[in-house]
Regions:
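Membrane-active, amphipathic/fusogenic segments and juxtamembrane/transmembrane anchors
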Residues: 1-73, 132-139, 147-149
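Generic structural signal for short, flexible, solvent-exposed coil/loop and linker residues
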Residues: 3, 14-16, 81, 87-88, ...
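A sequence-composition feature that detects small, non-aromatic residues
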Residues: 35-37, 64, 78, 84, ...
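Surface-exposed beta-strand edges and their flanking turn/coil or helix-capping segments
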Residues: 40-42, 76-78, 152-157
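Membrane-inserting effector segments that mediate pore formation, membrane fusion
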Residues: 69-126
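Amphipathic, membrane-active segments
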Residues: 109-160
Length: 160
């Protein structure tokens, strides 16, 4: 399992984009750090599928940061790129299972994509986890196997 954890202060960036810190699960754009406006946000194309899966299978609505968007990045690669997801501290605190449910949905999605294919697939995902300090988040960047994704639950719980 290959992952990297960064401490970020996103409050200033959110102010620049005229956005507020979400308090629930939210898809983050790939270009959050570099976009000039929320209309420039680019999301991973798998966000559309995952949004439907979260809603249909788990009754979880996950909005995109900045709401509606028309810009999606599609990659032609053997690797699987998942959308960045923000976890609000209040949601993690109030609903202890939200992390494991979310990671299971992501793992199952990747597993379904890999059915019938040969070779090893690598998953890429960024998770933003709000900390107790206002506007501060920990960004967990994961690159690894499908099975390793489920183990991120322990890593995230240790970060709180």
């Amino acid at each position: 399992m290959d992952y990297k954890i960064e401490d970020l202060d996103i409050s200033q960036r959110l102010d620049e984009l005229e956005l507020t810190l979400p308090d629930s699960l939210t898809f983050f754009p790939e270009n959050f750090d570099t976009a000039n406006a929320k209309s420039d946000f680019i999301f991973t194309d798998s966000m559309l599928d995952l949004s439907k899966i979260f809603l249909q299978d788990n009754s979880i609505v996950i909005p995109a940061l900045g709401q509606d968007t028309e810009l999606y990045r599609s990659r032609k690669s053997a690797d699987i790129y998942l959308p960045a997801i923000f976890f609000g501290l209040s949601q993690i605190t109030e609903n202890q299972t939200i992390l494991s449910v979310s990671l299971n949905v992501l793992s199952n999605y990747i597993y379904d994509l890999c059915k019938g294919t040969s070779g090893k697939k690598t998953a890429h995902v960024d998770l933003y986890i709000e900390t107790k300090e206002k506007g501060k988040v920990k960004k967990l960047s994961y690159k690894g196997s499908i099975n390793g994704l489920k183990d991120l639950d322990k890593v995230i719980k240790a970060m709180k």
